[in-house]
Amino acid sequence: MDYHKVDPAFGDWSDVEHLAEKYYLMFDYMINHISAQSPYYKDFLEKKDASEYHDLFIRYKDFWENGEPTEEQVDAIYKRKPRAPYVEARFADGTSEKVWCTFDEEQIDINCKSETAKRFIRDNLTTLCEHGAAMIRLDAFAYATKKAGTSCFFIEPDVWEFLKECEDIVKPYGVTLLPEIHEHYTMQE
């Protein structure tokens, strides 16, 4: 998936912009994760630490104090599957390591705290704003902020700070954000 292109089956950006002249358009943006088939993740698998996207993803070795979570830390995480949220990334050099994967092996979580991710998000949100978005739905937003020793779901105040960062990007365009939460926000308490 690439937020800079429209699937040709649906036209191109000029067609979307034409619709935006007449209709209120809401676009969906996966803020928490990216396709394992994306050029960004593939570049990471090919080049590992030499990839310009090496910190776009949440690498267990960097996230957890000892490179791995304790059983208690895994139990504390609000998970979408009955195990620790990771996929084994297999690099071109023959090595492998765990990267965060909340939902599915094809959906690799983004490290929203990294500068690479901040640029990536800014670039994508700006593209959507410039092509007619009136509202942008932030898919799986409550999972985007993660902190060791927590549920890694709707972590306060981090989640509000991250939402403010996103709002600052879209505000000049008059675009509204709709963060998807999945569950009642109080469940993290």
Predicted regions mapped to residue ranges:
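Hydrophobic residues within beta-strands of alpha/beta enzymes
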Residues: 136-138
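Acidic/aromatic-lined carbohydrate-recognition and catalytic surfaces
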Residues: 1-122, 126, 130, 141-189
